[in-house]
């Protein structure tokens, strides 16, 4: 089976042969630098990696594509089926994280004047003199 792929298609599936690595990296570097590269490779120490035609781009269609659409589709179905049975890492449920503190809505009109606040609740509202920070950062104080 032969796999004919132009550089424009390589990014979509991520595959290329070792013979074309130099070309792919050159094209990708040109794209990254927003530079249009000529097809002719200048003489350099690495020219042998661009053999046999010593040009940057491979002409499209020089290898006949013998893969039918149904064959490619069946491979895709088989891959997706195999992926379904691969164990994966457990995921964390996405949910909104509440803030570190909670400020309840306090409406004096809704408070019952006949209900008293117990001593324990009042003690929780007192801020100690040796408390330097509002949160868990008080470990930093000495």
Swiss-Prot record:
> What GO annotations for molecular function exist for this entry?
histone deacetylase activity, hydrolytic mechanism
What are the recorded Gene Ontology BP terms?
A: chromatin organization
Its predominant location is: nucleus
- What's the domain of life for this entry? Eukaryota
Q: Where in the cell is it found?
A: Nucleus
Instruction: List keywords of the entry alphabetically.
Output: Chromatin regulator, Hydrolase, Nucleus, Repressor, Transcription, Transcription regulation
Looking at the record, which segments are called Histone deacetylase? Answer: 14-34
- EC number(s) per entry: 3.5.1.98
**Hydrolase is among the record's keywords:** yes
Q: Which reaction does it catalyse?
A: N(6)-acetyl-L-lysyl-[histone] + H2O = L-lysyl-[histone] + acetate
Q: Where are the transmembrane segments?
A: none
Q: Does the keyword Disulfide bond apply?
A: no
Q: Which InterPro entries match?
A: His_deacetylse_dom_sf, Ureohydrolase_dom_sf
Biased region (Acidic residues) positions are 131-142
Q: Which GO terms describe its cellular component?
A: nucleus
Region ranges (Disordered)? 99-142
Where is this chain compositionally biased, Basic and acidic residues type?
A: 113-130
What does the UniProt record say this protein does?
Responsible for the deacetylation of lysine residues on the N-terminal part of the core histones (H2A, H2B, H3 and H4). Histone deacetylation gives a tag for epigenetic repression and plays an important role in transcriptional regulation, cell cycle progression and developmental events. Histone deacetylases act via the formation of large multiprotein complexes.
Q: Which family does it belong to?
A: Belongs to the histone deacetylase family.
Name of the protein: Putative histone deacetylase 10
